[in-house]
UniProtKB/Swiss-Prot annotation:
This is UPF0434 protein BMA2274. InterPro entries: Trm112-like (IPR005651). One of its GO terms (cellular component) is cytosol. Gene3D superfamilies: 2.20.25.10. It comes from Burkholderia mallei (strain ATCC 23344).
Length: 68
């Protein structure tokens, strides 16, 4: 995943920050409790493709996608 791309991506619903979950290959929005898949290195930022997350789901300890 390109670090420059991660710096500019936001949640398409709330425009809030996304957190990169390297293990699950997803970008997670904690505010909306949605996870957007990353397929072949490309984030799929379509609400219809996002999955609902469960509160307390661990996110990659490397932290938010911003600032990388």
């Amino acid at each position: 995943m390109d670090a420059r791309l991660l710096e500019i991506l936001v949640c398409p619903i709330c425009k809030g920050p996304l957190h990169y979950d390297r293990g699950a290959q997803e970008l997670v929005c904690h505010a909306d409790k949605l996870a957007y898949p990353i397929r072949d290195g490309i984030p799929v930022m379509l609400v219809d493709e996002a999955r609902q997350t469960v509160e307390g789901t661990p996110v990659d300890p490397a932290g938010p996608a911003r600032g990388r």
